[in-house]
């Protein structure tokens, strides 16, 4: 993560306003020993994100960077033995100076098994916020106009009106997007 912070630090000498850097941290497909395995991995993730934020602060870049986590699947709430099965909903972390932090965005589901939010199959919750909405807001931070979002995110209009004067979710600080 320190190497990423250093790469961000030289962006101006490369003539870049903003960059996209992708890191992969695999091994989250826990079908067994979910609690023990995930606790250790969350500790590693926490240490990495904390170290990254401290490096950004040391470089004076904390207000210029957004860190976003994403996954291609969630987990069911009901155990299938020693773990859980694949599901649709999940969660994302968004952090950085341009972010209105300390909030939960989206609608938290009723996590009671067989509730109206449970679509069956052992606690699969219907997502309430599309990843397209997260990406749409990040694209606005990169300077993509609202009208052009549907070129990059063909499904965005299923969740957000590109003619809106507001952001898809609202996690960006006012004045940090165009």
Language-model regions, residue ranges each:
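Accessory "access/gating" subregions that flank catalytic or transport cores
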Residues: 1-18, 22-30
């Amino acid at each position: 993560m320190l190497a990423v912070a250093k790469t961000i630090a030289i962006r101006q000498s490369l003539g870049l306003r903003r960059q996209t850097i992708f890191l992969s941290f695999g091994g989250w497909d826990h079908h067994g020993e979910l609690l023990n395995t995930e606790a250790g991995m969350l500790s590693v993730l926490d240490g990495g994100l904390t170290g990254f934020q401290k490096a950004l602060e040391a470089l004076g870049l904390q207000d210029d960077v957004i860190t976003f986590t994403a996954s291609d699947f969630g987990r069911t709430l009901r155990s299938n033995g020693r773990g859980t099965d694949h599901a649709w909903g999940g969660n994302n972390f968004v952090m950085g100076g341009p972010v209105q932090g300390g909030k939960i965005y989206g609608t938290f589901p009723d996590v009671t098994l067989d509730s109206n939010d449970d679509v069956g199959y052992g606690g699969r919750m219907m997502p309430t916020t599309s990843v397209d909405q997260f990406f749409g807001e990040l694209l606005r931070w990169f300077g993509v106009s609202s009208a052009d979002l549907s070129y990059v995110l063909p499904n965005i209009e299923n969740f957000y009106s590109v003619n809106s004067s507001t952001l898809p979710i609202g996690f960006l600080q006012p004045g940090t997007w165009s």
